[in-house]
């Protein structure tokens, strides 16, 4: 008959280990405290306190007993952690140092079956290994605080929880002002001089020959072509006239990025930026072709130009923000333009683009990259407090001033203003940039401590 017995032994620093006494033919004692048995699991003696705790191992044994069909009545007979009561909640991520743990003895009616005893022996040893791996992981993560982003308040995501006590205000004039501003910003047919860009020649036909690697592009204009100037830069070149500019960006296929020679080829960041622009255009065409989204983005670009606090917002961030404000709601139906415009300012004011916020994930990048992390902490704060001021002005009827229909309004974000007897005080910045270290201080620090890397300190948040 095969019998299995589990008991406890005392280790330095009050740690517990397991002794597995297996009578298989000849009696053999396997003490988990012995270096010969610990080496495959620990690679170090057990006296350093790295052995998995008795609590975690027993928790897995209890779970294993339940898996193989041992009922609650039989588990009551298993002496263990909670005065003989079965434990099912010891499999969590918390592993603590055990105190006052009783020995574990499997009941005789369980040990009456050879197959069950052998299974339990394997379960115990396997559980010890798993528990130890969990403990090692916890030791590595000790003191590490995982990043858990917060979700800023968005009224339109929880509108049902805040029922109105008054009828919705009439915003017809606000909607008309938005449409009027969009009409002023949209280029007319005369300004849109490019009709089409076509690939032609042997490249388009697929009849190119060796030694004549030339691709022909034809730009069809709506106007009479005049003499143009060409300006080369690090990203490609620009063809411009007094009224319009065409930018030509150069890149390569993604597999070639690993083969670039810095002394021979273009900067990899330039090539990656052009590839990203292609992904952005493709995503926008597939997901943001709704007319309200396009109008809102045009208005946001105008807002960025007229208010310095919004300058850090890149065109791609504005694209995603406009799409989010119009389409991301419980009904999955596009919101009205006036509602979406107000929502943009509200969620920016609530901290959508602050360091701890969930923000907006870039749909064209891998790894859950939050688009606002391209901004510095100072810029993120500036966007937030500028939006807070404009939200208060908008709430008191100052939309014409915000839209630029009543002259320059850039001062509103930094000066006190009055709207229908209500005084609006601009929000103040919450982030203070750390003082820059002097050259002498940096040299002293370098002499005291050896450098640990070549990376410069950056204010950009990292994922």
Swiss-Prot record:
Keyword set includes Transcription regulation: yes
Post-translational changes noted in the entry: Ubiquitinated at Lys-166 by CRBN with polyubiquitin chains by the CUL4-RING E3 ligase (CRL4-CRBN) and then degraded by the proteasome.
Basic and acidic residues composition-biased segments: 429-440
SMART domains per UniProt: DZF (SM00572)
Residues bearing PTM Omega-N-methylarginine: 94, 145
Any one GO molecular-function label of the UniProt entry: DNA binding
Keyword set, alphabetical order: Activator, Cytoplasm, DNA-binding, Isopeptide bond, Methylation, Nucleus, Phosphoprotein, Transcription, Transcription regulation, Ubl conjugation
Pfam families registered for this protein in UniProt: DZF_C, DZF_N
Name by which UniProt lists this protein: Interleukin enhancer-binding factor 2
Organism of derivation: Rattus norvegicus (Rat)
Upper lineage: Eukaryota, Metazoa, Chordata, Craniata, Vertebrata
The gene coding this protein: Ilf2
């Amino acid at each position: 008959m095969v019998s299995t017995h589990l008991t406890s032994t005392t280790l330095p620093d009050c740690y517990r280990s397991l002794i597995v006494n297996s009578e298989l033919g000849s009696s053999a004692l396997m003490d988990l405290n012995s270096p010969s048995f610990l080496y495959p699991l620990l690679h170090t003696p057990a006296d350093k306190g790295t052995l998995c705790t008795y609590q975690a191992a027993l928790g897995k044994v209890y779970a294993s007993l339940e898996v193989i069909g041992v009922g609650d009545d039989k588990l009551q007979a298993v002496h263990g952690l909670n005065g003989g009561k079965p434990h099912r909640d010891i499999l969590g991520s918390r592993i603590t140092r055990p105190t006052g743990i009783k020995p574990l003895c499997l009941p005789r009616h369980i040990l009456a079956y050879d197959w069950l005893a052998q299974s339990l022996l394997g379960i115990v040893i396997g559980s010890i290994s798993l528990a130890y791996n969990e403990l090692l992981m916890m030791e590595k993560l000790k003191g590490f605080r995982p990043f858990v982003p917060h979700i800023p308040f968005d009224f339109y995501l929880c509108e049902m929880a805040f029922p109105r006590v008054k009828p919705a205000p009439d915003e017809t004039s606000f909607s008309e002002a938005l449409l009027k501003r969009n009409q002023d910003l949209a280029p007319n047919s005369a300004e849109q001089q490019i009709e089409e860009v076509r690939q032609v020649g042997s490249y388009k036909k697929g009849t190119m020959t060796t030694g004549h690697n030339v691709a022909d592009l034809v730009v069809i204009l709506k106007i009479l072509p005049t003499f143009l100037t060409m300006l080369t830069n690090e990203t490609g070149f620009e063809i411009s006239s007094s009224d319009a500019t065409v930018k030509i960006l150069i890149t390569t296929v993604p597999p070639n990025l690993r083969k670039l020679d810095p002394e021979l080829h273009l900067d990899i960041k330039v090539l990656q930026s052009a590839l990203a622009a292609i992904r952005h255009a493709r995503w926008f065409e597939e997901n943001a072709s709704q007319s309200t989204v396009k109008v809102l983005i045009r208005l946001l670009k105008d807002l960025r130009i007229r208010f310095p606090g919004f300058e850090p917002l890149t065109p791609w961030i504005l694209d995603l923000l406009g799409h989010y404000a119009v389409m991301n709601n419980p009904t999955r139906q596009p919101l009205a333009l006036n509602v979406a415009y107000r929502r943009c300012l509200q969620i920016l004011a609530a901290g959508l683009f602050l360091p701890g916020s969930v923000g907006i994930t870039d749909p064209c990048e891998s790894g859950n990259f939050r688009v606002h992390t391209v901004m510095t902490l100072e810029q993120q704060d500036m966007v937030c407090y500028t939006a807070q001021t404009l939200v208060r002005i908008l709430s008191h009827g100052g939309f014409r001033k915000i839209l630029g229909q009543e002259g320059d309004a850039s001062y509103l974000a930094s000066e006190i203003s009055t709207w229908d007897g209500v005084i609006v005080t601009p929000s103040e910045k919450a982030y203070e940039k750390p003082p820059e270290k002097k050259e002498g201080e940096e040299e002293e620090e370098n002499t005291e401590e050896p450098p640990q890397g070549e990376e410069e300190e950056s204010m950009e948040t990292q994922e």
